[in-house]
């Protein structure tokens, strides 16, 4: 068990950055599977485990998906992970936000798991409503009960590439004690 004095998680968390410049080297499928398996340790409401991962390695399909997504301009095309949530596991109106909460927790765990296994990532926002969802389903066999939450570019960063330094809000702006 990790304890407060164990800096391994702290080192991992501070070392994770979004990467946008990937090498052409394909990842090992086993490496990706290990990261997803570790991400499955994420908690979920009532242990529903609604998150699913679709690993897309076909470069042509990746390019089409990123064109639909629209925000990955200037990124090198790599492999993608699509995080989807099985909406059939949620039956009540009061649970309508739960797939996003569960998937958000899973996504963060996935990003850390990828970092742990040496896979660089760049999470991208996805709007699964309207035309984008329809276009995506023409490319990939995604069931109607599956809601796309995020697209994650994965790969190995290009040698000598740099990543943006994203400054964090001051701690005092984030933490309130009452």
Model-derived features: positions:
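Acidic, surface-exposed loops and disordered segments
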Residues: 1-178
């Amino acid at each position: 068990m990790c304890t407060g004095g164990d800096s391994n998680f702290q080192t991992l968390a501070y070392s994770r950055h979004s990467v946008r410049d990937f090498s052409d080297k394909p990842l090992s499928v086993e490496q990706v599977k290990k990261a997803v398996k570790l991400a499955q340790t994420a908690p979920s409401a009532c242990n529903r485990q609604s998150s699913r991962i679709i690993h897309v390695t076909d470069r042509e399909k990746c390019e089409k998906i990123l064109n639909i997504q629209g925000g990955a301009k200037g990124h090198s095309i790599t492999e993608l992970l699509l995080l989807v949530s099985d909406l059939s596991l949620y039956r009540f109106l009061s649970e309508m936000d739960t797939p996003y909460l569960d998937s958000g927790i899973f996504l963060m765990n996935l990003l850390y798991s990828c970092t742990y296994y040496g896979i660089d990532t760049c999470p991208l926002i996805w709007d699964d409503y309207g035309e984008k969802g329809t276009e995506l389903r023409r490319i990939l066999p995604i069931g109607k009960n599956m809601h796309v939450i995020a697209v994650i570019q994965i790969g190995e960063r290009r040698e000598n590439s740099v990543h943006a330094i994203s400054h964090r809000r001051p701690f005092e702006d984030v933490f309130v004690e009452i």
